[in-house]
Amino acid sequence: MRYHISTNFFKKKYSDCLVFGIFDDLQLCESVKVIDSGSDGYVSRLIKDNEISGQINESLLLHSIPNFQKLKILFLGCGKKERFNINLYQKLFKTSINIIKKLSVKALIYFVTDFHIKNINTYWKIRHAVSEIQDNLYSFKNFKTSNNKNKFKISLEDIYFYLSDHDEINSGNNAIQHGYAISKGKKIARDLSNMPPNICNSSYLADQAMKLSQYYPDLIDVEIINDIDMNKLGMNAYLSVGKGSKNKSLMSIIKYHGISFSQCKNIILIGKGVTFDSGGISIKTSRDLDEMKFDMSGAAIVFGLMSIISDLKLPLNIIGILAGSENMVSSMSFRPGDILTTMSGKTVEILNTDAEGRLILCDVLTYVERFSPEVVIDIATLTGACVVALGHHTTGLLSNNDILAKDLQKASKQTRDLIWRMPLFEEYYKDLDSNVADMANVGTNSAGMITAACFLSKFSQKYAWAHLDVAGTAWISGKNKGSTGRPINLLTQFLLNKLYK
């Protein structure tokens, strides 16, 4: 897909389809007035006949318009102007693309400046329009045969954003560049998450990391920590998770050098990369077990983010860690009742081998102390309890630092990539007490998302840390299962905000 800024919407090469927003006050923007006048009041007659109401969720596609026979016009209802918001704006692009995909349209033009949102500028509108369009054009057909692949082709090739103000052209072009880089990185993350576990294991993650460094040799260095190295480091909790699998655990460290100043501290992004989670000895039921390939979504998100960061050449120093492992059942698997000594020296009693993500993360959280980080954010499909508490719309946020938490909440509000902060009250820590070790790896049956984060917080006391539990938001379940790429939009905005502080 190619994206462009246009200041003239009547050029023949992109006159296949025009897309307008219309509010319920039915006031026509200047561009629609030109169409209305040129078609002898055709649009006005449709409004008079109640064919166009401007109500939210309403859409009307016009063909064979008088004096514009080859032109299609799509009107998208925006509802009340004072209630129009980011959420509704993003949904309109999903609606429009779902309609356009069914048409023989090679080029279309969006009149984004007519979508009025309070305190939102043209740059934001275009950047998020590109991102929403690319999201809704996404499909994962890598393992379909060539005959089947052809069924999913669409005719659309070029999308234009009309700007009447020439002073906004540079901003519009920047928005396209940024939006496309973000959506490209999101696609990379979704593709990686959607890969089958017989192909995507820890070695595959490491190979992808190495390819990224080859693509951006001046910006990225990669170090792969294998199981022998981890054993020397004392990362016994991490290693225990992969003991039952023939696929060895590997930790891929992607170092992005966006600025040469040594005083610029590192931002650390850690992604849980369990490429398949059987639950281990505490084995899961067979229902939806195929979806446990998505337990590496955190690592995929971090990988996608490192691609975005490199494309945008952000002047930041960022380290992304893909914590790869596979939790399988065998005679070599770790067991309930085992006591593990973590890299930090703290001991953990294993009560449930299906609470494996925190065992990987606790050692990685200790490992990253060597980088003297400014902030550390881990992204993990950690607990089913998060899904129970927040469902599939909202990512769980837990943090030991109010400033970091507020920065993430701000980015969430800017992108509407939803998160909700949960508490780390002292009372919850008691649930992790063990009579034979420093702590247990699970608490009681209640507040599972919180106690899991309490566990992690014991290993992240030397820096500002946030945990994003994406168990409910990283993928969609069921027949149409697939990765969502969340929370890439949020984390990209968080990093961009760092530049403007």
UniProtKB/Swiss-Prot annotation:
<feature type="binding site">
    <location>
        <position position="277"/>
    </location>
    <ligand>
        <name>Mn(2+) 1</name>
    </ligand>
</feature>
<dbReference type="Pfam" id="PF02789">
    <property type="entry name" value="Peptidase_M17_N"/>
</dbReference>
<keyword id="KW-0464">Manganese</keyword>
<dbReference type="GO" id="GO:0070006">
    <property type="term" value="F:metalloaminopeptidase activity"/>
</dbReference>
<dbReference type="GO" id="GO:0005737">
    <property type="term" value="C:cytoplasm"/>
</dbReference>
<keyword id="KW-0645">Protease</keyword>
<feature type="binding site">
    <location>
        <position position="354"/>
    </location>
    <ligand>
        <name>Mn(2+) 1</name>
    </ligand>
</feature>
<keyword id="KW-0031">Aminopeptidase</keyword>
<dbReference type="InterPro" id="IPR011356">
    <property type="entry name" value="Leucine_aapep/pepB"/>
</dbReference>
<dbReference type="Pfam" id="PF00883">
    <property type="entry name" value="Peptidase_M17"/>
</dbReference>
<feature type="binding site">
    <location>
        <position position="356"/>
    </location>
    <ligand>
        <name>Mn(2+) 2</name>
    </ligand>
</feature>
<comment type="similarity">
    <text>Belongs to the peptidase M17 family.</text>
</comment>
<keyword id="KW-0378">Hydrolase</keyword>
<feature type="binding site">
    <location>
        <position position="295"/>
    </location>
    <ligand>
        <name>Mn(2+) 2</name>
    </ligand>
</feature>
<dbReference type="InterPro" id="IPR008283">
    <property type="entry name" value="Peptidase_M17_N"/>
</dbReference>
<dbReference type="InterPro" id="IPR023042">
    <property type="entry name" value="Peptidase_M17_leu_NH2_pept"/>
</dbReference>
<dbReference type="InterPro" id="IPR000819">
    <property type="entry name" value="Peptidase_M17_C"/>
</dbReference>
<feature type="binding site">
    <location>
        <position position="356"/>
    </location>
    <ligand>
        <name>Mn(2+) 1</name>
    </ligand>
</feature>
<dbReference type="InterPro" id="IPR043472">
    <property type="entry name" value="Macro_dom-like"/>
</dbReference>
<feature type="active site">
    <location>
        <position position="358"/>
    </location>
</feature>
<keyword id="KW-0963">Cytoplasm</keyword>
<feature type="active site">
    <location>
        <position position="284"/>
    </location>
</feature>
<feature type="binding site">
    <location>
        <position position="277"/>
    </location>
    <ligand>
        <name>Mn(2+) 2</name>
    </ligand>
</feature>
<protein>
    <recommendedName>
        <fullName>Probable cytosol aminopeptidase</fullName>
        <ecNumber>3.4.11.1</ecNumber>
        <ecNumber>3.4.11.10</ecNumber>
    </recommendedName>
</protein>
<keyword id="KW-0479">Metal-binding</keyword>
<dbReference type="GO" id="GO:0030145">
    <property type="term" value="F:manganese ion binding"/>
</dbReference>
<feature type="binding site">
    <location>
        <position position="272"/>
    </location>
    <ligand>
        <name>Mn(2+) 2</name>
    </ligand>
</feature>
<comment type="function">
    <text>Presumably involved in the processing and regular turnover of intracellular proteins. Catalyzes the removal of unsubstituted N-terminal amino acids from various peptides.</text>
</comment>
<dbReference type="GO" id="GO:0006508">
    <property type="term" value="P:proteolysis"/>
</dbReference>
